[in-house]
Amino acid sequence: MMKQKILFIMHMPPPVHGASMVGQFIHDSQLINSSFDCHYVNLAVATQLEDVGKGGWHKAKGVMKKLMEVRKAVKSVKPDLVYITPNSAGIPFYKDFITVMMLKVMGQKVVMHFHNKGVETRQDKWLDNWMYKHYFKGVKLILLADALYEDVKKYVKREDVFVCPNAIPAISNANGVTVNSNHVPHILWLTNIMKTKGIMEYLSALKILKDKGAKFQADFVGGLTKEMSGDEFDSALSMMGLNGCCTYYGPKYGDDKYSFFSQADVFVLPSYTEAFPVSILEAMQFALPVVASNVGGVSAGVEDGVSGFLLGGKLPIMLNTFRPDACEIADKLQVLLTDTDLRHKMGLAGREKFEREFTLEVFEKRMVEILSNNVKY
């Protein structure tokens, strides 16, 4: 029996971010590739993380080149289904709108896998509203969490939505992990140094903790971006008197990155907006309690009061206007810094949830099931 042909149009590294990592997992999946006749086009135009979401003439030429590459692949492969990981808002959405509409004109059956959110923030703009109506018409949608349906419900029926959370491969040195008990607890920030990740609010929270006499070591792992330069970051640390308890290590990958997880006691991610960050899953795998903003689909991973603490209230926040409160961050961190038993309990709860729901094996089986259903629609 002939396998169904699927053309995967998705982001793969470089640059390295959540969506590109998941794209690479799909590309390398033995189960997915053995279940279908798979063909791939890398949707990424930016090769540097700081260029993601930016415009410019050079980027525009890259978009046109990518559009022609997609068109050529469709004509050559003649797929039964096209899987694409487009953007939901802003300049990247306008670029992907053209690609999706071209696929529809070419008569393709399309399933879109959203690794981001933002539709609700733009749906009241007349142009975006018009584009969204055409963008979502006649397609199926894969979301990272049930909570994210709120972002697209104006345009997509619930029966046309599938949920497939992010996942990560098992890390050998996280197996049989023991929860850390550093004499001075280490708080791990492992994402890029960006204002939209809540870096300033987090630094303010650390200042509050230090002023209260709390003992901690804050480790920062991640790349610098145009949102915050190295000089600006250093200046903020100096201004708040945090140089003695904060260390910046730059971006780390592979075993170098995992060593920071294995040495940490608490993981923090006070972002303004997220969909379903892979870094939270990595923290859960290493049995770290998580303090994170309750934005997007974060609550699908972190259970408030069970495997960590959610910032901003009990209900998932979809709008990008959210800003974390430094005092709330400080309060949640102080609870974990002073209660070793609670850190252990929450960390192990997160680890157990990771093993049940977020391993790569679970993801692959779920993705094969979703793709099989969509090939038939």
Language-model regions, residue ranges each:
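Conserved donor-binding/catalytic core segment of Leloir-type glycosyltransferases
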Residues: 7-9, 178-207, 218-221
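Aromatic "clamp/platform" in nucleotide-sugar-dependent glycosyltransferases that forms part
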Residues: 272
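Donor nucleotide-sugar binding/catalytic pocket of nucleotide-sugar-dependent glycosyltransferases
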Residues: 133-175
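A short, well-ordered alpha-helix in the C-terminal region of glycosyltransferases
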Residues: 328, 335, 342-356
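Short alpha-helical donor nucleotide-sugar binding micro-motif in glycosyltransferases
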Residues: 251-252, 259-264
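Short hydrophobic beta-strand element within catalytic cores of glycosyltransferases
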Residues: 289-292, 302
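Glycosyltransferase donor-sugar binding loop
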Residues: 40-46, 190, 217-232, 250-251
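Nucleotide-activated donor-binding/catalytic signature segment of Leloir-type glycosyltransferases, i.e.
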Residues: 231-252
